[in-house]
Amino acid sequence: MIIVLLGAPGAGKGTQSVLVAEKYGLKHISTGDLLREEIANNTELGKQAKKLIDGGNLVPDEMILGLLKNAFLNRGKGVVLDGFPRTLSQAEMMHPIVKGLAEKLSAVINIKLSEDEITQRIVLRRQCKNCGNIFNLRFIKNFDGKCPKCGSTDIYQRADDNEESAKNRINVYHSQTEPVVGFYKNKTYYKEVDGSKNKEEVFEEISKFINRKK
């Protein structure tokens, strides 16, 4: 089974990807995590990627697709792709790779959210340094300064989680990622869900659709 989760920044792709992976026993794949792993392991690909990133350049699609191919080799029951493909060219390049696998593309789920909600979520997003948990103050009543997952007080806000950055990322989403939605929109395995609901409700809607497409 191969599941793709799309959506604007702050829509909850990461959260829902983890939940889907846990429920269906799938491998959670984030291209950002794959890149960071290659860089941390000082692989040849990691060295090339680091040089590009340090120079303020984007990592080319070919390099990302190479990472994805390697990740697919150890996919087990299947994968959840977290926020990938991000561009139309990535979607087009990924298509023949998926066609060559035994599993089919089971579901492409687009988490919809208004621009105001996206901005608020990005600004209120926090991460735990201890366990890596990402959470949102918007959904926590009477936040006590502790990570909801591990209880650590070592909480921080990522440097790019601010209003100006949110606007820039929304613009990039409209110009680069919305065409990906058009690529999949008329497929029977495409589904839009309302991301303004709480994560449990969103997950329930996603799960119902996946169950129908398994």
UniProtKB/Swiss-Prot annotation:
Principal subcellular localization: cytoplasm
Keyword field: ATP-binding, Cytoplasm, Kinase, Metal-binding, Nucleotide biosynthesis, Nucleotide-binding, Transferase, Zinc
GO cellular component: cytoplasm
Catalytic activity line of the entry: AMP + ATP = 2 ADP
Binding site for ATP: G10, A11, G12, K13, G14, T15, R125, I134, F135, K197
One GO molecular-function entry: ATP binding
Pfam families in alphabetical order: ADK, ADK_lid
Binding of Zn(2+), residues: C128, C131, C147, C150
Pathway recorded for this protein: Purine metabolism; AMP biosynthesis via salvage pathway; AMP from ADP: step 1/1
Disulfide pairings: none
Annotated EC: 2.7.4.3
Residue span of region NMP: 30-59
Protein family (similarity comment): Belongs to the adenylate kinase family.
Assembly with partners or alone: Monomer.
Domain notes per entry: Consists of three domains, a large central CORE domain and two small peripheral domains, NMPbind and LID, which undergo movements during catalysis. The LID domain closes over the site of phosphoryl transfer upon ATP binding. Assembling and dissambling the active center during each catalytic cycle provides an effective means to prevent ATP hydrolysis. Some bacteria have evolved a zinc-coordinating structure that stabilizes the LID domain.
Identification of the protein by name: Adenylate kinase
Species whose genome carries this gene: Elusimicrobium minutum (strain Pei191)
Organism phylogeny: Bacteria, Pseudomonadati, Elusimicrobiota, Elusimicrobia, Elusimicrobiales
Gene behind this protein: adk
